[in-house]
From Swiss-Prot:
Upper lineage: Bacteria, Pseudomonadati, Pseudomonadota, Alphaproteobacteria, Hyphomicrobiales
Protein origin, superkingdom: Bacteria
InterPro entries attached to this UniProt entry: UCP032146 (IPR008321)
Designated name of the protein: UPF0262 protein AZC_3148
Family according to the record: Belongs to the UPF0262 family.
Amino acid sequence: MSQTPPPNRLCAVTLDDASIGRSGADVEHERAIAIYDLLEDNRFTPVGDPGEGPYTLHIGLMDNRLVLDIRREKGSEPVVQHHLSLSPLRKVVKDYFLICESYYAAIRTASPTQIEAIDMGRRGLHNEGSTLLQERLKDKVEVDFDTARRLFTLICALHWKG
C-alpha cells in the first residue's frame, strides 16, 4: 500500500535556462540528480499561503537576485514570487566552488585520506550554505534542512553569471 505524499512539498522544479551557465554533461547530470533528490523528499511551505500544495518551483536569476517563482501544482497563477539578494550567499558559494575544484582534482591524484579531508571540508561548506539559505528563507518559505541542502545545490548549479 503506497503512502500519500504530504501536500506541502515540491512536485516539480525547473531552472531558468537563461540563468544557467554553460556546462558539460557532468554538471547537467548533477543538476538532474539534485532535482530528482529534491523531489523525492522535501518539505516546502510558502509562509502565509492560505492554500496547500503541492507546489512547483522555478529558480532563476534576475538583476543579480535569486528568483523563486512558486505556483500550485494545478494552476498557473503564482502563489508568490520571491527575489532574494545573492550577496549573503556569494562568499560561501565561491568557497564551495573552489573546494569542489580541489576535490575533483584530488580524485585523480590524491590519496584516499586527502580526498576524504577535502570532501569533509566540501560537506561543511555545503552545510554552511544550506543553513544560510534556510535562514534567508525563514520568513518566506518554510523548509527543513535537507530541503535547504538540495536547494543550495541547485542554486550553485545555476553558476550565476558575474
